[in-house]
């Protein structure tokens, strides 16, 4: 029976991974490692769940928290393209924090690491080039924001660490998973958009081109892909060792506006008029100045305006081929759970 650790386990995705691990037959103990205290810690009658408050940049504390662990699912990250954190803060957690986790793997002889990367490790790029493809599609990877850069660098670090020698001459095996736009209960950004619509009289004003298609994926299916990858990476000859996979399900691929309307229309939200692009650019520039001068974050800035209007559509079944992944939550269930959460959080 194994001991798993989930860094960022008190977060949006991490909590769902912990919930699913409770049903994993081969897991005896789950260590939930996060810099913040979980206000609603998950409990179980069949698994030992230990919560450890820890900064992943503190090697000594990380080493202590991971001593005796067999496998790490590393989700801890600062996900920010709005200006809440400085560039240095984002790099410190996302890149250097991953370095710390890898160093602990080597020092403690932990043989398996599943890393939560991001679609932004690939794109959309700073040029606004559309992406339609799979893990092996050629694309100009040129990050336009420090968050994307940090996830790209951390993913490369984890991929390079695969098959490296650790304590007692054993080998470290790694795998990276790249979620596209995650939604589901607990998604703060979806909640912000819903609240804005309510403030505007149940109207969603459109800010994104209809042909800017983005792949989306439900948080429960992303979590399930992590749990499956953690199982399969331990098999001799597993194809996932040293590989990266996009996270996907059968959620509709469409523009951000259209997706939000599909999700929220049963909650009384109606489509509004389109805000002119020149006006959006003007507000984005103003918000960028506020971020620079006053450290005031904003959902609308020049970076988010560009990437939301740039197609990023994933078409792949590689996770199914290599580790037998298929979604365990269909779209109707995913939407219903998300809607229920939005209603209850009003």
From Swiss-Prot:
SUPFAM superfamilies from the UniProt entry: NAD(P)-binding Rossmann-fold domains
KW Isomerase (keyword) present: yes
Database matches in InterPro entries: 3Beta_OHSteriod_DH/Estase (IPR002225), Lipid_A_modif_metabolic_enz (IPR050177), NAD(P)-bd_dom_sf (IPR036291)
Molecular functions per Gene Ontology: isomerase activity; oxidoreductase activity, acting on the CH-OH group of donors, NAD or NADP as acceptor
Stretches assigned to coiled coil: none
Gene Ontology biological process terms, A to Z: steroid biosynthetic process
Pfam family, one: 3Beta_HSD
Biological role stated in the UniProt entry: Catalyzes the oxidative conversion of Delta(5)-ene-3-beta-hydroxy steroid, and the oxidative conversion of ketosteroids. The 3-beta-HSD enzymatic system plays a crucial role in the biosynthesis of all classes of hormonal steroids. During viral infection, steroid production contributes to virulence by inhibiting the host inflammatory response.
Protein name listed in UniProt: 3 beta-hydroxysteroid dehydrogenase/Delta 5-->4-isomerase
Species of provenance: Monkeypox virus
Gene encoding the protein: OPG174
């Amino acid at each position: 029976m194994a001991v798993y650790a989930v860094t960022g386990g008190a977060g949006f995705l991490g909590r769902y991974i912990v919930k699913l691990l409770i049903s994993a037959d081969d897991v005896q103990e789950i260590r939930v490692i996060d810099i913040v205290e979980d206000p609603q810690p998950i409990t179980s009658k069949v698994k030992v769940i230990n919560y450890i408050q820890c900064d992943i940049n503190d090697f000594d504390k990380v080493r202590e928290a991971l001593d005796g662990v067999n496998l790490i699912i590393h989700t801890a990250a600062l996900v920010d393209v709005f200006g809440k954190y400085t560039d240095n803060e984002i790099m410190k957690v996302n890149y250097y924090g991953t370095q710390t986790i890898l160093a602990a793997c080597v020092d403690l002889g932990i043989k398996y690491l599943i890393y939560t990367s991001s679609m932004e490790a690939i794109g959309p790029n700073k040029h606004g080039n559309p992406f339609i493809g799979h893990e092996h599609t050629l694309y100009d990877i040129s990050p336009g924001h420090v968050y994307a850069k940090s996830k790209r660098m951390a993913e490369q670090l984890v991929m390079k660490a695969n098959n490296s020698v650790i304590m007692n001459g054993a080998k470290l095996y790694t795998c990276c998973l790249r979620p596209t736009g995650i939604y589901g209960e607990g998604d703060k950004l979806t909640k912000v958009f819903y609240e804005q619509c309510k403030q505007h009289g149940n109207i969603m004003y459109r800010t994104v081109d209809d042909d800017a298609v983005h792949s989306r994926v439900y948080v429960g299916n992303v979590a399930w892909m992590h749990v499956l990858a953690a199982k399969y990476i331990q098999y001799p000859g597993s194809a996932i060792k040293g590989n990266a996979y996009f996270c996907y399900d059968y959620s509709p691929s469409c523009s951000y506006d259209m997706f939000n309307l599909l999700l929220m229309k049963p909650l009384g939200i109606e489509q509004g008029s389109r805000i002119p692009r020149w006006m959006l650019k003007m507000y984005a520039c103003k918000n960028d100045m506020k971020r620079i001068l006053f450290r005031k974050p904003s959902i609308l800035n020049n970076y988010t305006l560009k990437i939301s209007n740039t197609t990023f559509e994933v078409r792949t079944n590689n996770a199914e081929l290599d580790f037998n992944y298929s979604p365990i939550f269909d779209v109707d269930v995913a939407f219903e759970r998300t809607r229920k959460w939005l209603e209850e959080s009003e």
